[in-house]
Amino acid sequence: MDLGSGLYLPIHSTHLLEHGHAAIKRVIVVVHGSGRNGNDYFERTIAPAAAMDLLEETLIIAPTFQTSEDGPSKDEPFWTSGGWKRGHLSSSSGPSPRVSSYTAIDRILELVLDSERFPILEQVTITGHSAGGQVTHRFAGTSRIENETAIPFRYVVANPSTYLYVGSERDSQAGFAIPNSAACADYDDWHYGLQDLNNYATAVSRDSIKVQLVRRDVRILIGSADSLNASLDVTCGANMQGRHRFERGQTLIRFMDAFDPGHGHQEVIVPGIGHSSTQMYMSEEGRSALFGS
């Protein structure tokens, strides 16, 4: 994928983006987890599309955000293992200019929103599971691409470790309140909250992030059995969001209810499923979130 300025991002795609496709009605951009295995997530998103006989009208794109360990080519930007998840700029030891991982997603979306390439496009969905879910939720609050089109967008956030909070309050026995942060001074910093924003988020502004994340169509897709701590962020800022992924998803919805009852987040629980992107996306609830109305 050509990002411009001589930079390229590895992607998997069901159709050639540059040439377009006249039959495409739906675009799904799926972001991999911490393993940076975009190819696996590509296949895991194709499976439900095929099961619903929607593959011919669906363009699935799976980018790969590399680190130095992945052996990127000299014209491929790479990030730290945490940086790509948070929308940080690519490494200064990689090619120039440095680019935010979220800007790279913006470039993909700009291409697919070209009506000459995809003239009957009806829906754009950004999704990710685990670390990809973190990217999806933060991207939903910070990207301005949706504002530039009338085509509906949806963000399907599956089993992330943490979420972006648009207020400084966190859950407590007394309800949502600003915590005593003496022992956890950075609990509300980016990427948990809206303090100390990175370059990409700063360009948007806190007020705009709040409005965007509150108003957009965001599906919080959580497995009821995702209650183990494997690969879970257990820093103090993360623990203020809940004990495990399932609880953190439910708590985020309760926060949004308290913050703005007219918000666009919807809780979608997948019964009996744990931390499995394959099972989440193939479930009835997952397929409805990805392909339903």
Give names to the regions the model predicted:
Residues 45-46, 133-146, 284:
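Short glycine-enriched nucleophile-adjacent loop
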Residues 150-258:
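The feature captures the conserved acid-bearing segment of alpha/beta-hydrolase catalytic domains
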Residues 221, 233-234, 250-293:
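C-terminal catalytic histidine-bearing segment of alpha/beta-hydrolase fold enzymes
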Residues 1-27, 35, 39-59, 84-93, ...:
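A domain-start/cap signature at the N-terminus of enzymes
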